[in-house]
């Protein structure tokens, strides 16, 4: 509207651009090329507006004009350094397009400090820590400061479970996973069952070492079934060799040789087609 008023040399442009600058930015994603002209006009008419360069940066980034996008976001951040999303965007751009890990982490941490209620930024900050190989125990300790945020996102719950498994806290991982109902999400295929099975296999190995063979059998048999709360079913051709191998070991310890051999034979069965 402001751009149209400017083109028509009509009154009221100042009021319209001032109002636009104060609008909530949620779900506002300019995506047409003509929006570039309108946003540039807004920046000229209201140089103190931090939202126009933010929107312009989003549009440029979508069109793969990464340097222009970052320049626009930097302008937005200078005008309003309390807007977390622009720092988040800059963090991702510096990491993915400039390979500047230190600056990316600095900006993402700043974004989260500005809004510690944003579960998405927490997830993205942890993923940055993961990419720069932050120790598992440090990441776990950081995440567990925000249990309410973790509970909002399946991927954060899964990351906590994964870190528990990676730090050897298999009982905690198992308990947390069994208490949560997951929903399918793109890119998450197979990740929840993998952690479900990992915790049980490691606990089964501990049970075997301690001579608790029946406990090990129960845990390993659970690996062969996908309960509903995992949010996905078993795929055809799922590799279960290790479960069968340890089941064979458990039955051997119980002097049930025939069953042990049967499970070991199942453990030798693999894909019938060659893989790359």
Language model region names:
Residues 28, 50-51, 84-85, 119-120, ...:
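Helix-start (N-cap) detector for alpha-helical repeat units in TPR-like alpha-solenoids
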Residues 25-28, 40-45, 145-150, 183-193, ...:
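Flexible helix-coil transition and linker loops at the boundaries of alpha-helical arrays
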Residues 6, 61, 95-96, 130, ...:
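Position-specific recognition of the canonical hydrophobic site in helix A of tetratricopeptide repeat
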Residues 13, 35, 69, 104, ...:
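Single-residue signature of alpha-solenoid repeat helices
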Residues 3, 58, 92-93, 127, ...:
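Residue-level recognition of tetratricopeptide repeat
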């Amino acid at each position: 509207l402001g751009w149209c008023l400017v083109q028509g040399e009509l009154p009221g442009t100042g009021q319209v651009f001032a109002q636009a600058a104060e609008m909530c930015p949620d779900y506002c994603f300019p995506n047409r090329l003509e929006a570039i002209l309108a946003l540039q006009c807004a920046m000229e008419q209201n140089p103190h507006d931090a939202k126009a360069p933010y929107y312009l940066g989003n549009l440029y980034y979508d069109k793969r004009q990464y340097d222009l996008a970052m320049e626009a976001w930097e302008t937005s951040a200078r005008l309003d350094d309390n807007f977390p999303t622009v720092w988040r965007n800059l963090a991702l751009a510096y990491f993915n397009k400039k390979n500047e890990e230190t600056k990316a982490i600095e900006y993402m941490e700043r974004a989260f400090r500005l809004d510690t209620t944003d579960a998405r930024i927490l997830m993205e900050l942890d993923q940055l820590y993961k990419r720069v190989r932050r120790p598992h125990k440090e990441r776990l300790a950081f995440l567990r400061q925000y249990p309410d945020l973790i509970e909002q996102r399946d991927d954060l719950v899964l990351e906590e479970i994964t870190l528990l498994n990676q730090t050897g806290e298999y009982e905690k991982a198992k308990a947390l996973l069994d208490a949560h109902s997951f929903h399918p999400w793109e890119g998450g295929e197979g990740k929840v069952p993998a952690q479900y099975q990992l915790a049980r296999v490691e606990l089964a190995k501990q049970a075997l070492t301690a001579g608790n063979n029946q406990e090990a059998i129960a845990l390993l048999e659970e690996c062969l079934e996908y309960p509903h709360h995992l949010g996905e079913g078993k795929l055809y051709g799922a590799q279960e060799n290790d479960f069968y191998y340890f089941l064979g070991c458990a039955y051997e310890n119980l002097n049930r040789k025939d069953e042990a051999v049967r499970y070991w034979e199942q453990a030798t069965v693999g894909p019938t087609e060659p893989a790359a």
